Structure formats: structure tokens, C-alpha cells
Amino acid sequence: MNLHEYQGKQLFAEYGLPVSKGFAVDTPEQAAEACDKIGGNEWVVKAQVHAGGRGKAGGVKLVRSKEDAKAFAAQWLGKNLVTYQTDANGQPVSKILVESCTDIAKELYLGAVVDRSSRRIVFMASTEGGVDIEKVAHETPEKILKATIDPLVGAQPFQGRELAFQLGLEGKQVQQFAKIFVGLAKLFKDHDLALLEVNPLVIKADGDLHCLDAKINIDANAMYRQPKLKTFHDPSQDDAREAHAAKFELNYVALEGNIGCMVNGAGLAMGTMDIVNLHGGKPANFLDVGGGATKERVTEAFKIILSDSNVAAVLVNIFGGIVRCDMIAEGIIGAVKEVGVKVPVVVRLEGNNAELGAKVLAESGLNIIAATSLTDAAQQVVKAAEGK
């Protein structure tokens, strides 16, 4: 689950980290009031969406009057912001962050992720702040500094100081960086984060360090023990199909192809997508119906897949273990009838009662193509999607 910038900064402040004074508002009038509360004669207004690239898309602006802040809020609230990280429809803006202006002398980068290879939290720092860190890592990997956190003792101040020296910081900046480093590490662990970024972490004109941005992603599998963070969830930022799928415990991720995929098991689902791609097709989604491929779940899965207008054919790939394939076939037939599927459906059943399941499908009289193997299924669905 992603957090908005203002929510991330709220957590930063709770851990004593330096952030700008600001207010998240949802009306133009509140934007003007926020300027009064903050004081000064310059403010930064930022549209709040779960996507990067807001500045280039016009979603971040320096304003010098309350009227300009009010106008910016009126321009974006209720609208969609399109950036290079969103689709063509963009993300809806329901909050504007109004905060004090910061005089920037230099921009740095500081972030942390869970590194699966080392099974540790790894911090990354760079002098190349304010830009796409993936691009820096690809083009100039030597500019990415790393510090691995030992889970037994946690982040240590000396690790922060070492990074600070490598970044060229000096004097009080070293101590400030070490404090930010340790604070972020504690925040990461306490809240079960999967990713954390401060980009940029800036050196202000007076020499002090300041967290100018906040990007936080929480491990969805740990949300049950983060009740406070559940209240931070903004459903308007979710993909509508993915949100609907979650209600039925279906794991769905929208893609850009035209072949809908419905599979039981994440590994089999990924393998199915690979073999479809191998035979010249493009998957429209990842969808794992889980171990219990019941009629209700299959029906909802069909509804979700077919809500994508790009889908020209559907591949159902089910391995029957505890659940018998003939029962799964009955569920597929019932779902196809209920939903009124108009596109070709290719079904590959394997496992418990697979032959009986194929017979049930063949006798249904519906536009369902029974595949004899995974390769056959991929070839059949690619042909069907091409209208052959």
C-alpha cells in the first residue's frame, strides 16, 4: 500500500525528522487558509497522487500569493493528474499539500528497500538527488552508496556517519544525517515498510539537512498488524479492477495485452503469462484465483477480466489438486453463462479428474475450447485473440 507525500511526512515528523511545515487541504479556501497558518510570502503547493513526475506534469508549483494557492487547488482538486508513471487516464487529485518554501543549496537521495538476496533492509544514498534513482543506478552505479542493516542490532549511527562522509557532508551535517538515517530505519521496521524514499533530501541554504519529499510503500502482507496505517489508505488511487478483485480474495494485476488469464496459483499464473508471450501473445492481466476455484470466484474473475475492453480472448489454466477438475469445469460453465462471455475462452485442465472435466466442457455447447496441454492452450488462445 502506498502513502501520499503528506502522510509520509506526518510519519517523518513523528520520528523527529526535519520536514517542512505544511497542511493537506481539500478545498481552495483551505489552501488559502493554510498559507496564513504557515506564514511567509512563498509557498509550495503539490497535488497528492500515488505517482512520481508531478512537477513536470504541472502538479507542483511555487506560489507567491494566497490567491495563486487557491487557484492551484481549484485547478487540480477533482481532476486527474497524468504523469509518466500513470496511465493515460492519470490519478485523481483529492488533496493538495501546501507547505513552506525551502531554499535549496544541494539535493541528495536517501532510500531503503528490503533486499531479498541478503534478506536485509538496505539503505541507498547518492549525491544525485531529485532525479530518477533507477536511471542513476543504471547509468552510473558507482554513485549509489549502500548500507545493510543487521536485523539483530538495527541501524547504527556509525553507518549513518560513514554514508555522510561518502556523500561529502561535513560538520553538523554528519550528525544530522546519522539522526535521519537511524530514524528512517526505525520507521521502516516499526511500520513494516517495503520501500522508503526521501528524494530529494536537501541541504538548505543555511547548511541544515531537510526531508523535502516522502515516498512510502507498506508491505501489504503486514497490514493486519498496522491498524493505524490502514486508515491512510486512499481507495481513489487504486485500480478499480484490482480493488474489486481484492474483495473476493483474487490477486489481480492489470497489464496492457489482449489475452485475459485466469489461473490458480501464482507460480502457474506467471508461467502461463510467459508461455502466452512465448507464442506471440500479450497477457492482459495476472489473475490468481487461489486454491478454491469456486463458481463464485470464477464468475467474479471473468467479470474483472472482461471489464478490460482490450481483452479479445481468455485463457483459463487450472490445476486440480484437492478440488476436482470436473467441479471446476462446472464452475467455469456456470460463470460463462452468468456473465455472458462473448469472447473465445480456452480452458486447460490438469490433475484430479481432468479428463472428466474436459468432457463436461465439450458437452456444454458453449464457445469453450478445451486444450490438451499448456502449449496447446497458449497456441489456441493466441489464435483466438487474433481472430483466426
UniProtKB/Swiss-Prot annotation:
Binding-site residues, substrate: 264, 321-323
Pathway(s) served: Carbohydrate metabolism; tricarboxylic acid cycle; succinate from succinyl-CoA (ligase route): step 1/1
SUPFAM superfamilies in UniProt: Glutathione synthetase ATP-binding domain-like (SSF56059), Succinyl-CoA synthetase domains (SSF52210)
Keywords: ATP-binding, Ligase, Magnesium, Metal-binding, Nucleotide-binding, Tricarboxylic acid cycle
Job description of the protein: Succinyl-CoA synthetase functions in the citric acid cycle (TCA), coupling the hydrolysis of succinyl-CoA to the synthesis of either ATP or GTP and thus represents the only step of substrate-level phosphorylation in the TCA. The beta subunit provides nucleotide specificity of the enzyme and binds the substrate succinate, while the binding sites for coenzyme A and phosphate are found in the alpha subunit.
Taxonomic source organism: Pseudomonas putida (strain ATCC 47054 / DSM 6125 / CFBP 8728 / NCIMB 11950 / KT2440)
Spans traversing the lipid bilayer: none
Family: Belongs to the succinate/malate CoA ligase beta subunit family.
GO process annotations (BP): succinyl-CoA metabolic process; tricarboxylic acid cycle
Gene3D superfamilies from the UniProt entry: ATP-grasp fold, A domain, ATP-grasp fold, B domain, Succinyl-CoA synthetase domains
Needed cofactors: Mg(2+)
Known EC number: 6.2.1.5
Enzyme class: ligase
Annotated GO MF terms: ATP binding; magnesium ion binding; succinate-CoA ligase (ADP-forming) activity; succinate-CoA ligase (GDP-forming) activity
Record gene name: sucC
Cofactor note as given: Binds 1 Mg(2+) ion per subunit.
Gene Ontology CC entries for this record: cytosol; succinate-CoA ligase complex
Protein name: Succinate--CoA ligase [ADP-forming] subunit beta
Ranges for domain ATP-grasp: 9-244
Pfam families xrefs: ATP-grasp_2, Ligase_CoA
